[in-house]
Amino acid sequence: MTYRSIGSTAYPTIGVVLLGGIANPVTRTPLHTSAGIAYSDSCGSIRSETRIYADEATHIYFNGTESTDDNRSVRRVLDRYSSVFEEAFGTKTVSYSSQNFGILSGSSDAGAASIGAAILGLKPDLDPHDVENDLRAVSESAGRSLFGGLTITWSDGFHAYTEKILDPEAFSGYSIVAFAFDYQRNPSDVIHQNIVRSDLYPARKKHADEHAHMIKEYAKTNDIKGIFDLAQEDTEEYHSILRGVGVNVIRENMQKLISYLKLIRKDYWNAYIVTGGSNVYVAVESENADRLFSIENTFGSKKKMLRIVGGAWHRRPE
């Protein structure tokens, strides 16, 4: 049977062991191990939607605007799987359309993973880890969104592999409150290109691997607090190194909020994560989520209640 299109959905991500440094701009293989979670809101409305469809010429659309895709990453993945499209659609020529909804950060992972979900929907016997390796051309941490829950992407700088550590159900007693600030984001490539200049980078690579192994141990006993406490420690190390090479992600009001969170911690547990953008993500036990969400002074940020969710998925081809 010949189809005309397939749609898919994937969810954005938050780093837990933060990634800094890629091997090269083409394969985007990470230089060291990292970890992350996929997130959305209570009804799954924070997401990336993708449609791949047969066409007379290839067009690539992001949020309704056609892109030249100058780095050719999406086009490269579509070309790589042209035989899959030919088998399903009767033609190798396809177009791609992606739309993001409410994403705070991690949209590249979601966009890449939604491509992977569509490809796997058309050819289920493909190895998802092989597909993930190709998706890295779009986003180096695409596996976080492709597999969902809590994942670790093990990497030695030459080869990378994403391992699913915990399903989202393991986090059912926890919520994440996002505090979104209106600061300009540092592009991920600025971080990747600068952090490797630090004299502390070799130690950072070692610590990231150690943190990932510790998270895997915490996961064995469902020590969710241990995982997020370590994520906060990782955030603090990571951004200290970035400041040392002139990349300041945590701006004034973000730091004020972080200081306030540490005061709140005397009353009830919380742990924060800052990745490369202008958001402070705060893990908290669900019983205290409303208390955290209702704090009056957010230092100019907007709040959003989040939860950890599963991997990317596809619809029935049409």
From Swiss-Prot:
Gene3D superfamilies: 3.30.230.10, GHMP kinase, C-terminal domain. Optimum temperature is 55 degrees Celsius. It catalyses: (R)-mevalonate + ATP = (R)-3-phosphomevalonate + ADP + H(+). It is an enzyme of class 2 (transferase). SUPFAM superfamilies: GHMP Kinase, C-terminal domain, Ribosomal protein S5 domain 2-like. Optimum pH is 8.5. One of its GO terms (biological process) is isopentenyl diphosphate biosynthetic process, mevalonate pathway. Changing residue 185 to K: Strong decrease of the affinity for ATP and 17-fold decrease of the catalytic efficiency compared to the wild-type. The keyword Transferase applies. Pfam families: M3K_C (PF21433), MVD-like_N (PF22700). GO terms for molecular function: ATP binding; kinase activity; phosphotransferase activity, alcohol group as acceptor. Keywords: ATP-binding, Isoprene biosynthesis, Kinase, Lipid biosynthesis, Lipid metabolism, Nucleotide-binding, Transferase. ATP binds at residues 96-100, 105-108, 185, 188. Catalyzes the phosphorylation of mevalonate (MVA) to yield mevalonate-3-phosphate. Functions in an alternative mevalonate pathway, only present in extreme acidophiles of the Thermoplasmatales order, which passes through mevalonate 3-phosphate rather than mevalonate 5-phosphate. Homodimer. Belongs to the GHMP kinase family. This is Mevalonate 3-kinase. It comes from Thermoplasma acidophilum (strain ATCC 25905 / DSM 1728 / JCM 9062 / NBRC 15155 / AMRC-C165). The lineage of its organism: Archaea, Methanobacteriati, Thermoplasmatota, Thermoplasmata, Thermoplasmatales.
